[in-house]
From Swiss-Prot:
It comes from the Eukaryota. The heterodimer non-edited LVP1 induces lipolysis in rat adipocytes. Induction of lipolysis by LVP1 appears to be mediated through the beta-2 adrenergic receptor pathway (ADRB2). The edited BmKBTx-like, similar to beta-toxins, may modulate voltage-gated sodium channels (Nav) and may block voltage-gated potassium channels (Kv). Belongs to the long (3 C-C) scorpion toxin superfamily. The lineage of its organism: Eukaryota, Metazoa, Ecdysozoa, Arthropoda, Chelicerata. This is Lipolysis-activating peptide 1-alpha chain. Keywords: Amidation, Disulfide bond, G-protein coupled receptor impairing toxin, Ion channel impairing toxin, Neurotoxin, Potassium channel impairing toxin, Secreted, Signal, Toxin, Voltage-gated potassium channel impairing toxin, Voltage-gated sodium channel impairing toxin. GO terms for cellular component: extracellular region.
């Protein structure tokens, strides 16, 4: 009986540790000029997805399920044209600001 109680306590503690750790950060798949997700071949962290995510206005991204995934990418910046308008610092293209 004591072993069963001890086992139950251990299970509860491990489940609490998992819930304290939290869930995955929110994010999105960025879309290119044709409205498609960016394909990638090297799963996990790679330079290509990092660059794509920076163009879309976020700092971190990686290859997940053969597509670039950007953490904390908001819905308004998923499309490349919307992201460029919002994050481009080029005063020739946007002389009066955004």
């Amino acid at each position: 009986m004591m072993k069963l109680v001890l086992f139950g306590i251990i299970v509860i503690l491990f489940s609490m540790i998992g819930s304290i750790h939290g869930s995955d950060p929110p994010g999105n798949y960025p879309l290119n000029t044709y409205g498609n997700k960016y394909a990638c071949t090297i799963l996990g962290e790679n330079d290509f997805c990092q660059k794509i995510c920076k163009v879309h206005g976020v700092q971190y991204g990686y290859c997940f399920n053969s597509r670039c995934w950007c953490e904390y990418l908001e819905e308004k910046d998923v499309n490349i044209w919307d992201a460029v308008k919002r994050h481009c610092k080029n005063t020739i293209l946007y002389p009066k600001g955004k």
